[in-house]
Every structure is written in structure tokens, then in C-alpha cells.
């Protein structure tokens, strides 16, 4: 099989013809049966020469410059990767500090510093096998052998049979809470049970007479202990209060409500500055006298003006 090799030359290699010949002789010694193509790298990058992809088994790059001038553009690395076949090798004067760029473009860095284009790895999907459920009492497939309900001849469950099994399943039953409460009340009335066991309570049910009596007694205790502020409403406070004389009611009203005058006196005693009420000035006798004087003065001026006109006319 003929090995196709591309000899890629840097433009500055023309200054050393012996270098190119030595590389060619080395290639001939290593690969007796080969086909060699020689190109200048600038002609490939500029598009003057178009090479086919996946064509060359090896590419030898010759760059006689120093190591600091061996840098390759990313597009050139990608182009060389496209020209190589799978398991193709790029050898020669390669930059040592661009191994990461080569990896990003699909190369694998070899032990000798060469860049290798690996074969694409085929993705293999492992499919899990379905487990066949065989719920039969006998290993053979005789029709006369007993089978469970819901299993066909192949030993698999059927949809219709599964729905039949679901319909035959017993639904759990729950006892109503109302019946339980009535049962507890009956036991308490008969004296068979001392106290009901703790359980769920129905908050939507109406309060019993016993609960109402307990609530009234609690309200009375609150009134007696002067804790009426914790009652539900003002009407509840009045229900537990005894009827007293009118004098007591008046005294309680005085304790509850405060007079406006008392409030003002307390503010004055606290040395608070109360702004003075704004009042409009009232017209007095002095103001009327001033207006009268102005009117008299105007009349005199008018008379003098009339006399002056008559004299001048």
C-alpha cells in the first residue's frame, strides 16, 4: 500500500536547500513505498493550492527558524488536521507551546512531540433487556396448566386483566367521625366510659350545652378577677357583669371616658406649648375715624381742583 506524504515547507527554507534534501532522503529510507507531495505553506493558506481532505498519511513540516518563531495560527492547525487521514501524523518543526491548541483542534500529542489525528470513537448504546414476568405454576406452556388471573399464555400481564385485578382490590373503609362522637357521648351518659380518648375533633359541629356553660363560667371568672380585657367583646363583658346602681355606672363611665378640659389641663401641667388661636382683626372706632378723615380730605381736593378749573377757564 502506497503511503501518501506531504512535505510542507516554510518560505524561509529556500535559504537552505540541503535541509530539504536531507529530509527527503530520510523519508525514503523510512518508507520505501511512498508518494511525496511538496508545497509551500503560504500557497495553501492563501488558497492558491487546494488540497483534498483526508488524503495524507503523514505531513512533514520544515521551518528553519528559531523556536520562538515556530508559532502556527489556529486556522492552519485545523487545516492540517483536515488534510490528514485517521491515524495520520504531523511531524517536523512544530511549536512546543501549542500542544493545547492542537488538542483543541482534534490532535493527540505523541511521546516524540508529533501530533496524531485519532480515529473517531463510535458511540455504542447499551439497551437494557426487558425482564419477562413469568408468573406460572408450571414451566411448560400447556393451556391446561393453572395460571394466575391477569397473565396471558406468554406469562406477561395484560391491560384488561390488570384492570380486573384493580377492580377486585378491596377499598379501605373509614368510620365517620360523627358516629364516633355520638358513640362517645352515649358511653359517657351510661357511665361505661369515664372520659373519651383523645382524637380528631370536628370544628364545624355546633357547641354543646356543656361547652356553653363552661364558657360562661370562664367569662364570670374573668370578670371577677378584673381580666375583662381578655374577653371576646364588650358585649361579653356586659353579660357577666352584675347590675349595680346608677351611681356606680356613672362612676365607671368617669373612669372609662376622659373630659376634654381635663385633657387640656394635663397638657398645660406638662409645660407643653399650645399655639395661639388665629383671629382676624376687628374694625373698631379708630379704623372708622381714619376712613372718615380720608374721605373728607378727598372732598377738599376735589373742590380745590374745581375752583382752579373755573379760574383758568
From Swiss-Prot:
Residues 134-144 have a biased composition (Low complexity). Gene3D superfamilies: Fe-S cluster assembly protein Dre2, N-terminal domain (3.40.50.11000). Residues 189-207 have a biased composition (Polar residues). Residues 233-254 have a biased composition (Acidic residues). Residues 185-270 are annotated as: Linker. Residues 134-155, 187-254, 271-313 are annotated as: Disordered. The keyword Nucleotide-binding does not apply. GO terms for molecular function: iron-sulfur cluster binding; metal ion binding. Residues 1-184 are annotated as: N-terminal SAM-like domain. InterPro entries: Dre2_N. The C-terminal domain binds 2 Fe-S clusters but is otherwise mostly in an intrinsically disordered conformation. Belongs to the anamorsin family. This is Fe-S cluster assembly protein DRE2. It comes from Lodderomyces elongisporus (strain ATCC 11503 / CBS 2605 / JCM 1781 / NBRC 1676 / NRRL YB-4239). The lineage of its organism: Eukaryota, Fungi, Dikarya, Ascomycota, Saccharomycotina.
Amino acid at each position: 500500500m502506497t503511503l501518501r506524504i506531504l512535505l510542507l515547507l516554510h518560505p524561509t527554507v529556500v535559504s537552505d536547500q540541503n535541509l530539504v534534501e536531507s529530509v527527503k532522503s530520510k523519508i525514503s529510507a523510512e518508507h520505501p513505498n511512498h508518494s511525496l507531495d511538496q508545497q509551500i505553506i503560504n500557497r495553501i493558506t492563501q488558497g492558491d493550492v487546494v488540497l483534498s481532505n483526508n488524503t495524507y498519511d503523514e505531513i512533514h513540516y520544515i521551518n528553519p527558524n528559531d523556536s520562538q518563531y515556530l508559532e502556527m495560527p489556529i486556522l492552519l492547525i485545523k487545516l492540517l488536521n483536515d488534510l490528514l487521514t485517521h491515524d495520520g501524523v504531523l511531524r517536523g518543526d512544530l511549536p512546543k507551546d501549542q500542544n493545547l491548541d492542537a488538542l483543541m483542534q482534534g490532535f493527540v500529542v505523541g511521546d516524540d512531540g508529533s501530533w496524531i489525528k485519532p480515529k473517531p470513537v463510535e458511540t455504542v448504546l447499551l439497551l437494557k433487556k426487558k425482564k419477562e414476568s413469568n408468573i406460572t405454576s408450571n414451566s411448560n406452556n400447556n393451556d391446561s396448566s393453572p395460571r394466575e388471573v391477569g397473565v396471558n399464555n406468554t406469562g406477561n400481564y395484560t391491560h384488561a386483566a390488570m384492570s380486573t385485578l384493580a377492580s377486585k382490590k378491596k377499598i379501605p373503609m373509614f368510620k365517620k367521625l360523627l358516629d364516633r362522637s355520638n358513640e362517645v357521648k352515649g358511653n359517657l351518659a351510661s357511665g361505661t366510659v369515664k372520659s373519651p380518648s383523645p382524637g380528631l375533633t370536628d370544628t364545624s359541629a355546633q357547641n354543646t350545652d356543656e361547652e356553653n356553660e363552661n364558657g360562661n363560667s370562664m367569662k364570670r371568672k374573668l370578670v371577677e378577677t378584673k381580666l375583662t380585657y381578655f374577653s371576646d367583646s364588650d358585649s361579653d363583658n356586659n353579660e357577666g357583669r352584675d347590675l349595680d346602681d346608677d351611681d356606680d355606672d356613672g362612676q365607671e363611665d368617669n373612669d372609662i371616658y376622659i373630659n376634654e378640659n381635663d385633657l387640656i389641663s394635663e397638657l398645660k401641667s406638662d409645660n407643653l406649648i399650645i399655639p395661639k388661636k388665629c383671629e382676624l382683626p376687628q374694625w373698631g372706632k379708630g379704623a372708622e375715624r381714619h376712613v372718615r378723615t380720608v374721605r373728607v380730605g378727598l372732598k377738599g381736593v376735589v373742590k380745590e381742583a374745581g375752583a382752579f378749573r373755573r379760574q383758568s377757564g
